[in-house]
């Protein structure tokens, strides 16, 4: 897992209690209160997608914590929800349109016999952080 690898690389402890499998808004509503009640409450959340991050954001606000002063929140996808949340959500833009266009081009090439179907194709699509109001 990238998160754990980054911690280990920087000689930081991996606290499994802070890692939750949560990929949707409803699960974020269920799991975030548990994390916020820990003795050493997290001061930041990174979510697998923007919908999950919005769930975290809503729980944090409902608990009376100030975003981003007390808790920072970052999503991943940079979809339209990030631009209408309150506060506006910081998110990693994964360039989904470009990803889809490349995938479709590769599929069409394979279907047309231009590409060997047994060959694995690896493409790197760079992401970028879109900083808004939910992080400091």
Kindly label every feature range from the protein language model.
Residues 1-136:
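Bacterial carbohydrate/catabolite-sensing allosteric modules
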